[in-house]
């Protein structure tokens, strides 16, 4: 099962309870609705490796020894990150089971379900959320504004 993540970048996460968000992402990985627990042979993470939510997801997948695919939207993405985040991103790209150049549309097509960290505002995560709904993909929505799942 391929589970993608879409969520806000660091600049949009300021003011939100980041620890709570990370806990909810981990909860979604380990106890995703409809499954008892994740297992290495059945769970593949999918993300774009942006700063913020994407890197948190990759860290959690890595710590649970789960495979992941990275869909890189553009090569210069790391130029918009802190040096530390760019280094972490580079490490995760090197560890990915599959890495390819692709946009949100391809991630939505390739995933079975999605975890979305979204506060309800317009932007890239909103666009991805709309695509997931249109494709009738199951969505585990983590709202950092209201702290509602």
Q: Which sequence ranges carry the predicted segments?
A:
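Acidic/glycine-enriched connector segments
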Residues: 2-149
């Amino acid at each position: 099962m391929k589970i993608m993540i879409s969520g806000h970048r660091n600049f949009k996460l300021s003011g939100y309870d980041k620890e709570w968000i990370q806990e909810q992402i981990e909860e979604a990985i380990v106890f995703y609705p409809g499954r008892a627990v994740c297992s290495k042979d059945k769970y593949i993470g999918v993300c774009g490796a942006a700063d913020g939510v994407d890197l948190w997801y990759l860290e959690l997948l890595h710590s649970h020894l789960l495979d992941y695919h990275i869909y890189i939207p553009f090569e210069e993405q790391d130029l918009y990150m802190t040096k530390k985040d760019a280094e972490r991103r580079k490490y995760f790209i090197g560890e990915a089971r599959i890495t390819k150049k692709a946009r949100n549309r391809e991630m939505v097509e390739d995933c079975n379900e999605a975890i979305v960290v979204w506060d309800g505002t317009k932007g890239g995560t909103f666009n991805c959320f709309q695509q997931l709904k249109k494709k009738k993909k199951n969505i585990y929505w983590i709202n950092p504004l209201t702290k509602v799942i």
